[in-house]
Swiss-Prot record:
It is an enzyme of class 3 (hydrolase). One of its GO terms (molecular function) is GTP cyclohydrolase I activity. Gene3D superfamilies: Urate Oxidase. It comes from Thermotoga neapolitana (strain ATCC 49049 / DSM 4359 / NBRC 107923 / NS-E). This is GTP cyclohydrolase FolE2.
Amino acid sequence: MKDVQNEKDTRMVPLKKVGIKDLSWPLKILLKGDGYQPTVAQISCSVDLHREKRGIHMSRFIEVLNGLEEITPHIFEKVLDDLIVTMEAKRAHLEIRFPYFVWKESPVTRKVSPLKVDCFVEAEKEKNFSFKIGVRVPVHNLCPCSKEISDYGAHNQRAFVEIHVRTRKFIWFEDLVEIAERNASVPLYTLLKRPDEKFVTERAYENPKFVEDVARDVALDLEKDPRITWYRVYVESMESIHNHNAFACVEKGDFVLEG
């Protein structure tokens, strides 16, 4: 059978990335406590393409991914190595996104319910292996300016804290979720009874924060964590009284701590 992908290409244009995108894939995520949580991930992966090759064999991505059942740096590096060998490439890239549920107790009545967060894993291999993980966590923010100038209440809304990190040691997704939540006005809960709602509302009012405040506070927490070698923080507020959202972002290296 004729191999069209292996035909010689005369245009002599190398391609940086060629691959598949948004493939749904079952995975197991290791829990911080014990056991695994099953999830359905969206996978995108690619390799570089030599200037004399017309195309890649897309089916080979799936063949390599058949060995991917859970998320660890060791497994990711093996998948990338296999892609490089199978595709006769110099560089391979892998990106995975998936929903993850953390179980939380409401602050007063201690009712337990799951909170969905979005998790990201990104890995690349050329000469060296690089690996990043991240989370996107829903939180609750109350506006300091609105509180200061209003006789009654203050506008408040959901916000999302997105954290991406590179680490020298293993770090749990739950650890990043905790960092995001403790630097917001108040965490978000799926299930709240009236005593819980009272607590959350009053706590947010006592702890007002701009998106700028949250981004800076999260960055300072990440700076102090010896496991983390690089980070990027992005905070977006779903503004309740404006016809736009507000955001703030910061990356390691954007500032130098004094003192």
